[in-house]
């Protein structure tokens, strides 16, 4: 291989690296806003994987394209190819590189996993990312919020204040502790803007922690196919300042109790009234009685 060929390959590799790094930065814009401390780590990991994947993809496709266009046999060339039986050095290289890449990806992924301090499925506890927000405010934690899931409605209870709501209110920059339970089937607690997801198993209480860092209204979805109206099992997650959060709790304790919102139950009730029940399905759980609204 002469100097000219080596120079061209180096230039192409540098250009490919630049494009890959650019794609990795663009990957941040493909995701929702970063509304939790955990989202920063997850987005960095996603950007890393996009960068690496772009380099490999265009490197392989570029090599194949060059081979097809410039290394193919002539139109009327019917001669046999060179009798190459193998190349031990090349085979070692293309085996070693993927192994090292997989180890690199696994190591980085484990570092993210470890920094989030996730204990794993045996304990059914996600302790969240203890080091994600290096501030004194992050040391403060809220009392545990009970999250009850049933077909197809979310119910949130703040036991210390005796407040119940169908919307999840959270304070900004404070550790949030949730106690997740399911009354019927497996549900998925998933907030895309927070990059957190936890399956909720019937008959088990699962402790889950994270840190909201951005005020706003986000969507909580059931990420598991839990039945007919699972797509309607959505609600708002409202992140507000600690002062606004405390005011909301205080005002909620003074509100009279009333049935909360349940899109699944409302839709089913309308179908029953109109006589268009359709296929047989489980009757949605009635709206919970709430005072936080």
Give the positions of each predicted feature.
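Alpha-helical transmembrane segments of integral membrane proteins, especially early/N-terminal helices
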Residues: 6-27, 55-62
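Alpha-helical transmembrane segments
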Residues: 42-59
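Alpha-helical transmembrane segments and their helix-start/interface "positive-inside/aromatic belt" motifs
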Residues: 1-14, 46-50, 88-99
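Hydrophobic alpha-helical transmembrane segments that serve as membrane anchors
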Residues: 55-67, 102-105
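Non-transmembrane, membrane-proximal soluble domains of secreted or membrane proteins
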Residues: 21-46, 68-293
